[in-house]
């Protein structure tokens, strides 16, 4: 694939993002662009992310600089992956809400979006989160469920069995398969019927 768009939300797993981006560039895509929410930039500086991708896009006040907006970014990507996807971003996407550059780009995406949740097990098991995940799937998106592994838990400050993202090389392979399965779907959606 030539163009991979990665959306990054504010989960502690964002600290591992450079490893994922490096794997994506090495094994998956020629070009990688990243959209970061404000919460994500508070945990990982965009300047660090820029070292392992082609361009970083942020939520910020409009400027006179010509930057691609959500429609252009959505059309640019051959595959769009949200990594990590918080419960908040999953909920907004499932309910058609666009409150920032990332969520409006999700709404504008002409291809199915791949969500890689990083959510605390207590939240992940809530009925509302599972409903939102099922809504995304019904809408044609893919959700790659977290796996169980020993990981650092922020709230306890200890290493515990928890839900974590799929390892970078394996995730790159999964994304390649998803891209191949959906390749004919890439492109602009058909125009709406007249009268709408």
Predicted regions and their residues:
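A cross-family phosphate/adenosyl-ligand binding-site feature
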Residues: 1-115, 120-196
């Amino acid at each position: 694939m030539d163009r991979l768009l990665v959306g990054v939300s504010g989960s502690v797993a964002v600290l591992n993002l450079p490893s994922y981006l490096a794997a994506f560039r090495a094994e998956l895509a020629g070009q990688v662009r990243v959209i970061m929410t404000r919460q994500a930039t508070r945990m990982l500086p965009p300047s660090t992310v820029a070292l392992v991708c082609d361009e970083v896009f942020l939520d910020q006040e409009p400027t006179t600089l010509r930057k691609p907006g959500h429609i252009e970014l959505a059309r640019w990507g051959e595959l769009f992956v949200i990594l990590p996807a918080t419960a908040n971003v999953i909920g907004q996407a499932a309910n058609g809400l666009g409150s920032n550059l990332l969520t409006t780009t999700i709404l504008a995406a002409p291809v199915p979006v791949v969500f890689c949740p990083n959510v605390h097990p207590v939240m992940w098991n809530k009925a509302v989160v599972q409903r939102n995940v099922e809504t995304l799937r019904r809408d044609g998106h893919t959700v790659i469920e977290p796996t169980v592994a020993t990981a650092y838990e922020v709230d306890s400050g200890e290493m515990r069995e928890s839900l974590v993202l799929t390892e970078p090389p394996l995730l790159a392979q999964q994304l390649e398969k998803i891209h191949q399965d959906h390749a004919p779907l890439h492109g602009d959606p058909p125009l709406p019927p007249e009268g709408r």
